[in-house]
UniProtKB/Swiss-Prot annotation:
Record PROSITE patterns: G_PROTEIN_RECEP_F1_1 (PS00237), G_PROTEIN_RECEP_F1_2 (PS50262)
UniProt protein name: Olfactory receptor 5D14
A biological-process GO annotation: G protein-coupled receptor signaling pathway
Superkingdom assignment: Eukaryota
The keyword Transmembrane appears for this protein: yes
Keyword tags: Cell membrane, G-protein coupled receptor, Glycoprotein, Membrane, Olfaction, Receptor, Sensory transduction, Transducer, Transmembrane, Transmembrane helix
Gene name in the database record: OR5D14
Membrane-related topology note: Multi-pass membrane protein
GO MF annotations in UniProt: G protein-coupled receptor activity; odorant binding; olfactory receptor activity
Residues passing through the membrane, by range: 28-48, 57-77, 102-122, 142-162, 199-219, 240-260, 274-294
PANTHER family per UniProt: OLFACTORY RECEPTOR (PTHR48018)
Keyword field contains Zinc: no
Spans within the Cytoplasmic topological domain: 49-56, 123-141, 220-239, 295-314
Subcellular location: Cell membrane
Length: 314
């Protein structure tokens, strides 16, 4: 506890090296990431608003989707602004407390999203495999508990890792070779022994991935078998459309997490890690609302209706 208080009182400063060292790429990358961030904010907030104001979407599936959009919006807003700032500003410093909070909030969002994706897979399993029991099985109380559990567990692991990070000694030079305060990059600049934090991170990441992917894969095996039994071509197409959109999001998100955190003794270069990190910090939050809305006629119709309502055409 004394070590934690001492670290907070001394307030060391970190420097984020950013995404690239090449000056000629910084402005083009700034414009690309800015566009992606705008799409992310508009897409996710738009999804939340559409689900909130339209009674047609007051169902468990859209309830979970609204929370997924909220987590994506928060996560992108935690990471991307600092990424954009470092691409155009000479001063790349970040205070100790700000860095720790960025790590904690971003990691919380990642873990929460992984469990929300598992919850959404289970929801689709119940809807497709047991449609007659869907409204009973997926009650409002159960949906609220599943979402609350995702948020609470999303905070638990990152909080434990944060406690260990706060005990580390950062005496400088505190240069983080990343575009945000990612945990492995953050603790690597410490002068303390970081074996335990690394083992904890690997254990938490592996446990979370095993649990969520087991739920997801089991759900989709049953979904796939059930869909093959559907005689109606339109019904089979609709079921596969929902399945495919969810699977696309899962592949991008979990594939990156497995690559970065669940492969021990990885020899990947730091630049490779940065590029991979972009997929789950910038690309995935942007794609999720596009994936779900472009494959959903009801969402597209509601979106254009909202646009025409708010922006009258003469």
């Amino acid at each position: 506890m004394m070590m934690v208080l001492r670290n907070l009182s001394m307030e060391p400063t970190f420097a984020l090296l950013g995404f690239t060292d090449y000056p000629k790429l910084q402005i083009p990358l700034f414009l690309v990431f800015l566009l992606m961030y705008v799409i992310t904010v508009v897409g996710n907030l738009g999804m939340i608003i559409i689900i909130k104001i339209n009674p047609k979407f007051h169902t468990p599936m859209y309830f979970f989707l609204s929370h997924l959009s909220f987590v994506d919006f928060c996560y992108s807003s935690i990471v991307t602004p600092k990424l954009l700032e470092n691409l155009v500003m000479a001063d790349k410093s970040i205070f100790y407390f700000s860095c720790m909070m960025q790590y904690f909030l971003s990691c919380t969002a990642v873990v929460t999203e992984s469990f929300l994706l598992a919850v959404m897979a289970y929801d689709r399993f119940v809807a497709i495999c047991n449609p007659l029991l869907y409204t009973v099985a997926m009650s409002q109380r159960l949906c609220a508990l599943l979402v609350a559990g995702s948020y609470l567990w999303g905070m638990f692991g990152p909080l434990v890792l944060l406690c260990y990070a706060l005990r580390l000694n950062f005496s400088g030079p505190n240069v983080i070779n990343h575009f945000f305060c990612e945990y492995t990059a953050l603790i690597s600049v410490s002068g303390s022994d970081i074996l335990i934090p690394h083992l904890l991170l690997f254990s938490f990441a592996t446990f979370n991935e095993m649990c969520t992917l087991l739920i997801i894969l089991t759900s989709y095996v049953f979904i796939f078998v059930t869909v093959l039994k559907i005689r109606s071509v339109s019904g089979r197409h609709k079921a596969f459309s929902t399945w495919a959109s969810h699977l696309t999001s899962i592949t991008i998100f979990h594939g990156t997490i497995l690559f970065l955190y669940c492969v021990p003794n990885s020899k990947n270069s730091r630049q490779t890690v940065k590029v991979a990190s972009v997929f789950y910090t910038v690309v995935n939050p942007m794609l999720n609302p596009l994936i779900y809305s472009l494959r959903n006629k009801d969402v597209k119709d509601a979106f254009w209706k909202l646009i025409h309502t708010q922006v009258p055409f003469h």
